[in-house]
């Protein structure tokens, strides 16, 4: 009989995509996968596209919800735990994988009450509150970066397989270095929601550098027309709302400018690319710490949001346009931090705890 895994992950791509990579690894080994999520977040639409059945509980964050939501919180959580209990009793998984998001809290409690072993994976350099608590009841704790937990196995972030199949950066960049002079290909990612500071600053840089660069700018949902208008039909820019084929985009790029979400950092390492990171400013400095994973080995440059001006960015880019060897060195350093077997290792741990 096939073994069963229940995945608890939701809210953002940083939680969902690594979990999908693990699911696919286990499906190849004959496992059945079911997903626990919420109806109003991205997993509701995304997960079924991978032919993975999904069950829903009602839970959301409390931030910004007001006093009434705080008063109702214990009852909301209890209701979500009971919903998760019913799903676990119906599905009877051999193990539960917690990958983060609000759904993981009630799901983790329900799994513990049903004596189902929990494997926890923290994607960020600093653990979220839900995972800090779940780590106390998990059978095994895994992490992408070595700083999240003092006692956990560091395995990296599972990333899409096609990134690991790209040519080694030394080969990729060598071919470009021997070609005729060409513009510096810059991949700009504002994230799925769009990063306003990036979307505002890059058009100024594109205008200043002209044909010395070519920009592919992923502007984020709802920003396509606005950003396109800002560029004013510049012939060194291509603007899209989303990028469907990330492997192709990374393969095209000489440099990436983006936020430093955990999955993005690990994808850039897997592809072997230099990066300029603009960490989202949050009180726990989560994205800044994610970025240091590559910056500390010389593979990336961190520019804090208040310093992300056109003038400062020009001062960084102009030397790189002239010194392509520097970009090659950064790309190779990034690739040394890749963890191509992360999904495989998470799958191995799940198999171990299910025995």
Curated annotation (Swiss-Prot):
Gene Ontology biological-process entries: carbohydrate metabolic process; cell division; cell wall organization; lipid glycosylation; peptidoglycan biosynthetic process; regulation of cell shape
Binding annotation for UDP-N-acetyl-alpha-D-glucosamine: 12-14, 124, 160, 192, 243, 262-267, 287
One MF annotation (Gene Ontology) recorded for this entry: UDP-N-acetyl-D-glucosamine:N-acetylmuramoyl-L-alanyl-D-glutamyl-meso-2,6-diaminopimelyl-D-alanyl-D-alanine-diphosphoundecaprenol 4-beta-N-acetylglucosaminlytransferase activity
Catalytic activity: di-trans,octa-cis-undecaprenyl diphospho-N-acetyl-alpha-D-muramoyl-L-alanyl-D-glutamyl-meso-2,6-diaminopimeloyl-D-alanyl-D-alanine + UDP-N-acetyl-alpha-D-glucosamine = di-trans,octa-cis-undecaprenyl diphospho-[N-acetyl-alpha-D-glucosaminyl-(1->4)]-N-acetyl-alpha-D-muramoyl-L-alanyl-D-glutamyl-meso-2,6-diaminopimeloyl-D-alanyl-D-alanine + UDP + H(+)
Membrane topology, as annotated: Peripheral membrane protein
Pathway the protein contributes to: Cell wall biogenesis; peptidoglycan biosynthesis
Lineage top rank: taxon: Bacteria
Entry keywords, A to Z: Cell cycle, Cell division, Cell inner membrane, Cell membrane, Cell shape, Cell wall biogenesis/degradation, Glycosyltransferase, Membrane, Peptidoglycan synthesis, Transferase
Cellular localisation: Cell inner membrane
EC numbers, comma separated: 2.4.1.227
GO cellular component labels: plasma membrane
Family annotation (PANTHER family): GLYCOSYLTRANSFERASE, UDP-N-ACETYLGLUCOSAMINE--N-ACETYLMURAMYL-(PENTAPEPTIDE) PYROPHOSPHORYL-UNDECAPRENOL N-ACETYLGLUCOSAMINE TRANSFERASE 1
Family: Belongs to the glycosyltransferase 28 family. MurG subfamily.
Function field: Cell wall formation. Catalyzes the transfer of a GlcNAc subunit on undecaprenyl-pyrophosphoryl-MurNAc-pentapeptide (lipid intermediate I) to form undecaprenyl-pyrophosphoryl-MurNAc-(pentapeptide)GlcNAc (lipid intermediate II).
Protein name listed in UniProt: UDP-N-acetylglucosamine--N-acetylmuramyl-(pentapeptide) pyrophosphoryl-undecaprenol N-acetylglucosamine transferase
Native species: Haemophilus ducreyi (strain 35000HP / ATCC 700724)
Species classification: Bacteria, Pseudomonadati, Pseudomonadota, Gammaproteobacteria, Pasteurellales
